[in-house]
Amino acid sequence: MSAERLVNPHSDSDDQQVEKSLRPRTLSEFIGQEKVVEQLRIAIAAARGRNESLDHTLFYGPPGLGKTSLANVVANEMGAKIKITSGPAIERAGDLAAILTNLQANDVLFIDEVHRLNRAVEEVLYPAMEDFALDLVVGKGPGARSLRLNLPRFTVIGATTRLALLTSPLRDRFVAVHRLVFYSDDAMTEIVSRSARILGVPISPEGAREIGRRARGTPRIANRILRRVRDYAQVVADGAITLQVARDALAQLEIDELGLDENDRRLLRAIIELFNGGPVGLSTLAAALAEEVDAIEDVYEPFLLQLGFLQRTPRGRIATRRAYEHLGLPYPERTLPADDESGPQQATLF
């Protein structure tokens, strides 16, 4: 169910086609992530000035924030070709060897979900990143011998939503590590306005801001919502997205003022109504919602934690006072604060 949500930050096949047309090509076109962009600008200028390939770079952060877009921008700024793959797609060491031997000087190899590379593949990648060499074993048995094949200098750009799952040897081989954060409302408004121009959709500044501020600080979600609001404006209004049209469309899509959809509210209500506000274990909560544990951790929780609606404690998940207030539910006064280290206490009955 989470894969069908408008506010799901993960990409689907429909998104991928549209994202290509909306993707920035240069750092000057990239909106937001100012610190990362400035650091990349300096690194790229220095590498080009020395006529060298860019240092291996890692982007990490929640999905939908532009890690793939930045990799394409870096390749374009370096005047290099980019080869795009992902951790799960490289199943065997031979798959990676085939990719590496086809790279040209200064090419960029972008590995999405780099934390999902298996250990055998990582062992091949280590010397390739460090020494620009590919170690091969020729033959079998007693007659087997090792062969080192030199590779042209290239750049590996990795992307991950789970930095902690990267092995230390792999993480250490990335010279530059950049954290991408959720975007501000101003940046989101600018992104929506830019996407609307590219898609040929008339939109007012107020309409763009309304969509942007409800998109959970995530450009992928903003672009997805924009397409749905465009459809609404075309059928119900005169095709232009005004503030009122945006509000009406978002109400129909059940995306509230803070960017929560019905599934977010259902999760919070489950904690509050089924488990007395928590704490509740992740597996128990997933079973109650008929959701996967990974979906709750990766899709639902990051934004709810950012809003302060949810707490993670050693005893389980807890709905905060803010969550009660947002849902219009009375908050039970407790004998100890909800954020006490021992977790929430029994609600006061008398």
From Swiss-Prot:
Residues 331-350 are annotated as: Disordered. It is an enzyme of class 3 (hydrolase). Its EC number is 3.6.4.-. One of its GO terms (biological process) is DNA repair. Residues 257-350 are annotated as: Head domain (RuvB-H). SMART domains: AAA. InterPro entries: AAA+_ATPase, AAA_lid_4, DNA_helicase_Holl-junc_RuvB, P-loop_NTPase, RuvB-like_N, RuvB_C, WH-like_DNA-bd_sf, WH_DNA-bd_sf. GO terms for molecular function: ATP binding; ATP hydrolysis activity; four-way junction DNA binding; four-way junction helicase activity. Residues 1-183 are annotated as: Large ATPase domain (RuvB-L). Keywords: ATP-binding, Cytoplasm, DNA damage, DNA recombination, DNA repair, DNA-binding, Hydrolase, Nucleotide-binding. One of its GO terms (cellular component) is cytoplasm. Mg(2+) binds at residue 68. It holds the Pfam family AAA_lid_4. Belongs to the RuvB family. NCBIfam families: PRK00080.1, ruvB. Homohexamer. Forms an RuvA(8)-RuvB(12)-Holliday junction (HJ) complex. HJ DNA is sandwiched between 2 RuvA tetramers; dsDNA enters through RuvA and exits via RuvB. An RuvB hexamer assembles on each DNA strand where it exits the tetramer. Each RuvB hexamer is contacted by two RuvA subunits (via domain III) on 2 adjacent RuvB subunits; this complex drives branch migration. In the full resolvosome a probable DNA-RuvA(4)-RuvB(12)-RuvC(2) complex forms which resolves the HJ. PANTHER family: HOLLIDAY JUNCTION BRANCH MIGRATION COMPLEX SUBUNIT RUVB, PTHR42848. Has 3 domains, the large (RuvB-L) and small ATPase (RuvB-S) domains and the C-terminal head (RuvB-H) domain. The head domain binds DNA, while the ATPase domains jointly bind ATP, ADP or are empty depending on the state of the subunit in the translocation cycle. During a single DNA translocation step the structure of each domain remains the same, but their relative positions change. This is Holliday junction branch migration complex subunit RuvB.
